């Protein structure tokens, strides 16, 4: 019995204090295997359905045709130019919208007067989708990059503002009062108590905004562009190049997925105590 107990303790220590049961380990491996096979199975099913004759291959091309269209897109030299144009719009819009969202979220969350002034307006504007602004953005900015960035900033800003606003309001008011009573400068109090306390909410809002920035990219490039992934999708659709349309959609989805994974890894380092 003592030997069994000591062995159990050793296993617990090696697994971080938790004894992993064989069933849970097996289930985890099965889940990983299923996840790894899901995409290949989907691609195979797609290929079979497309070539079965039950659908029009021109409108629903198989993955092999889509892959060939993407390779041709890359060989033409246009792909990387389109990729960089879209990434520039997403990244710049995300940075500007995120920074404005955090700044105004802290102000409206911390100061009731500013909240009373701005929050009603923001709540009215927030539900308006960026694509609804495409006609007026073209009138205001023409086909310049400013209009495209405006649309991405619009989509990112309200998501980050709302999460920051809620996060700041969730900070313990007792800590703030105690810090001010002890003579802590207001700027230091905002940085070390308010911002730090709201940080988990801010990070969640920013991660959500990563995906939203790609949604709004569609509206931005439909507002008139001469390069970009969505622009190329639109041109391919007009020429009935369905393979390139689907290839562009796949590229857009992959870009969004990679950006989300990278931000999730960064978020784990930023909010390490959660």
Regions found by a protein language model. Name each.
Residues 123-159, 166-167:
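Generic hydrophobic transmembrane alpha-helix motif, especially the helices
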Residues 1-38, 261-274:
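Transmembrane alpha-helical segments of polytopic membrane transport and secretion proteins
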Residues 150, 154, 186-220, 247, ...:
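Transmembrane alpha-helices
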Residues 112, 169, 200, 204, ...:
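C-terminal transmembrane helix and the adjacent membrane-cytosol boundary/short C-terminal tail
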Residues 163-205, 229, 233:
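Short cytoplasmic-facing helical segments at TM-TM junctions of multi-pass membrane proteins
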Residues 92-122:
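Transmembrane-helix boundary motif in ABC transporter permease subunits
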Residues 16-28, 51-96, 235:
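Periplasmic/extracellular loop-to-transmembrane helix junction in inner-membrane transport proteins
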Residues 138-139, 168, 215-252, 271-274:
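Glycine-rich helix-loop "coupling/hinge" segments at transmembrane-helix boundaries
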């Amino acid at each position: 019995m003592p030997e069994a107990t000591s062995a159990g303790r050793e296993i617990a220590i090696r697994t971080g204090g938790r004894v992993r049961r064989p069933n849970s380990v097996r289930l985890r491996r099965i889940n990983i295997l299923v996840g790894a096979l899901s995409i290949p199975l989907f691609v195979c099913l797609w290929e079979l359905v497309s070539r079965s004759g039950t659908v029009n291959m021109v409108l629903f091309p198989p993955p092999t045709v889509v892959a060939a269209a993407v390779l041709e897109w890359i060989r033409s030299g246009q792909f990387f130019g389109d990729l960089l144009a879209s990434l520039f719009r997403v990244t710049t819009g995300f940075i500007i919208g995120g920074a404005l969202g955090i700044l105004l979220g802290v102000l409206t969350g911390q100061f009731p007067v500013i909240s009373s002034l701005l929050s009603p307006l923001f709540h009215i504007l927030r539900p308006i989708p960026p694509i609804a602004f495409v006609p007026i953005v073209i009138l205001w900015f023409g086909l310049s990059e400013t209009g495209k960035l405006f649309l991405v900033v619009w989509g990112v800003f309200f998501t980050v503002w709302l999460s920051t606003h809620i996060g700041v309001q969730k900070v313990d008011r007792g800590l703030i009062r105690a810090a001010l009573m002890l003579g802590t400068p207001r700027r230091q109090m905002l940085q070390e108590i308010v911002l730090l306390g709201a940080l988990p909410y801010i990070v969640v809002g920013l991660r959500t905004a990563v995906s939203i920035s790609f949604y709004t990219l569609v509206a931005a490039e439909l507002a008139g562009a001469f390069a970009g992934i969505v622009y190329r999708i639109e041109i391919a659709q007009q020429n009935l190049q369905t393979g390139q349309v689907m290839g562009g959609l796949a590229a857009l989805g992959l870009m969004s997925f990679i950006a989300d994974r990278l931000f999730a890894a960064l978020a784990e380092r930023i909010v390490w105590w959660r």
